[in-house]
Amino acid sequence: LPWFYFSGACSESLFSVIGNQNVVKKVWLPTEVFPAATVLGQLVHFFLAMIVLVFFILGFSVFWDIPSGPEQGQALGFYILPGWEILLLPFLILLQTMLILAISLILSSLNVFFRDVSSINEIVMSAWFYLTPIIYPANFAREQLEEKGLSFLYWIYLLNPMTPITIAYRRIF
């Protein structure tokens, strides 16, 4: 879900200024409003999806009586019910939204001058998806790089701004 929020908001905000060029020409309005509105719209979708996820998690843990907690959950490889870290979720969402807003402002302004930004964005987002620990744990990347004697690349890997955010979401849920 965090990745869909990120990629959806960044991709949609590309055309937010160009799509509203009539409004920009007729009324004085800061152009930053359009990417911000797109990001906030995606944030609403993200909140709705998170509500569904929470009900799904609660449904699994309550109705099917799956044991929860670190001692039982480790046998399954994950925790069913989130711990105290769930209290950090609003701060994590705020941090992710600020990152998305910054990238969206940059992309939407670049797209005004260079129309190929949208094509490049698709390629970059596809590559970025695989460079972020979404479908694999971050420890897997570290272990693979250490095996090959390239442990210094792991620190470069951690410079990906979505990597710590994804790790934090995994820790919470």
Show which residues each predicted segment covers.
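Short alpha-helical transmembrane interface motifs in multi-pass membrane proteins
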Residues: P2-S7, W84-L92, F152-W155
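Residue-level recognition of specific faces of alpha-helices
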Residues: S16, N20-K26, S109, F113, ...
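Hydrophobic alpha-helical transmembrane segments
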Residues: S16-P30, V54-I57, G69-G73, E122-E146
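Transmembrane helix boundary and interhelical loop/hinge segments in multi-pass membrane proteins
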Residues: Y5-T31, P35-L43
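Short hydrophobic, aromatic-rich alpha-helical segments embedded in or entering the lipid bilayer
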Residues: Y130-F173
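Transmembrane alpha-helical segments that form the membrane-embedded catalytic/substrate-channel core
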Residues: P2-S13, T97-S109, Y130-N139
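Alpha-helical transmembrane segments and their short interhelical loops
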Residues: T31, T38-V124, W128
